[in-house]
């Protein structure tokens, strides 16, 4: 992503930027047998899509979600939630007889989470499988930005993943920018080498990488941030935001390398979607003309608010106030 002074690109082209996030939304259950359970929906890229939509005026940025769902009532409720949040579902694939995946979240006294998943037969695994996916794959090139995570890659069949990567290559060749959040979950991959191969294929197409240090260390094992930045530079990634939890975020971009301190939170309730919300705020700021330093501050501010609430999606009334300075630079699309 290149930063220039001047007006935002959507103003110059008289249309909003089109952004699509690719991944999986699941049925979320929270609680325990003793106290009971509550049900909602979640998923890393879906969480990011919702927060991106909340932070982006519809006149500037159109946010869509790309996945596959079934014909059951939970799938219908998911799509209604997305629409209510301003997230478009026009490119959601509907598969007869399929259904969403499901997961349980349990949190300890420090707000750290334990997940139990049932997703092996989820509709999202088939998003890019078969000839029925051809139109969806072609539509990826219609977007200005495509956002994916490591989970977006992991949940797909091997055939679907390769079809997606081929479509991403075509889209990027036609001018689409790629944003990648590494979110590495070892249990979703047959082995680490398969994950490294898929990540490498996508990183070679990536313009902006939003990286969680712990996940990256687990997969690639870089000794320090310097080694990570060098490796991502070799992949051709022009902007990297390295998320390190409560520590400062480290940025590598065309302006050099620098750090942006995190906001301190006295009482953490639930860390679910902390990284997803950071990524959403960072991207929202960049797409509206903010520089990487301001984008990281937006990310820290939203993440700090999210971890003080239970669940991935906080109430709209709890969203922090985030604003761009009038002299902000613009992201060149």
Where are these regions (language model features)?
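Short, electropositive alpha-helical surface patch
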Residues: 74-87, 171-172, 195-206, 228-229, ...
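Glycine-rich phosphate/adenosyl-contacting loop at the front of the ribokinase-like
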Residues: 1-87, 333
